[in-house]
């Protein structure tokens, strides 16, 4: 994603608490507007790439732990924590999106509590991954438990992110006016800069790209499905 500018947040009269949530984010990429939900899903793209690293690492850990870099897994976990858990989940979803969706009611309102519980479980698993990989060499003693932890995180977050992308985020956007979309956009931009610094998204993309390269996962063509005939 190219560097994206967001307009400054101006709280509208009468928009308080969870109602601020119902503001969306519109960004400009060149002359093209990018919606808040699209931006949230782009952030999910970074996290999905981290989950793919985890899933591939789990396979290798079960066959030959020496082929898995503990340092690469630690860097992935640190990225997942900083970009996913501390920024995307806590500062955007839990602070703004989930309260608004619950307040709006409807089908989507039953998801925020479940999603928040899964966020917490994910943080516990990230704690474990960081503890195992920090300055350690992976071997037969820690490889299988780590593989199980990685697999459980991937299994949880795949349907988790899919429900957010297809149910929760669209429900959030549906209750927004165009003005509210503009207002929340800059609030999210302020949060991103405060939490991650300038070019936070682009930095996250570079980090996960470097990790993929380190683990031999950078070439997309290698994952093209083969058909048995």
Give, region by region, the residue ranges found by the protein language model:
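Small-residue-biased structural context
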Residues: 1-229
């Amino acid at each position: 994603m190219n560097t994206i500018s967001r307009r400054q947040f101006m709280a509208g009269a009468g928009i308080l608490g969870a109602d601020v949530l119902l503001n969306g984010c519109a960004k400009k990429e060149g002359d093209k507007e990018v919606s808040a939900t699209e931006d949230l899903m782009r952030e999910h793209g970074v996290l999905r790439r981290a989950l793919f690293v985890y899933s591939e690492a789990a396979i290798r850990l079960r066959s030959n732990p020496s082929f898995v870099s503990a340092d690469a897994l630690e860097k992935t976990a640190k990225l997942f924590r900083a970009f996913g858990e501390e920024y995307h989940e806590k500062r955007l979803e839990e602070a703004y999106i989930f309260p608004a969706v619950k307040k709006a009611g409807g089908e989507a309102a039953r998801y925020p509590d479940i999603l928040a519980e899964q966020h917490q479980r994910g943080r516990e698993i990230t704690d474990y991954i960081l503890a195992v990989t920090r300055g350690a060499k992976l071997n037969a003693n820690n490889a299988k438990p780590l593989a199980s932890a990685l697999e459980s995180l991937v299994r949880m977050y795949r349907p988790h992110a899919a429900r957010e992308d297809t149910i929760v985020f669209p429900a959030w956007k549906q209750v927004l006016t165009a003005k509210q979309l503009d207002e929340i956009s800059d609030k999210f931009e302020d949060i991103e800069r405060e939490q991650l610094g300038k070019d936070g998204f682009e930095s996250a993309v570079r980090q996960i790209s470097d990790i993929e390269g380190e683990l031999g996962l950078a070439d997309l063509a290698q994952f093209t499905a083969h058909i048995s005939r």
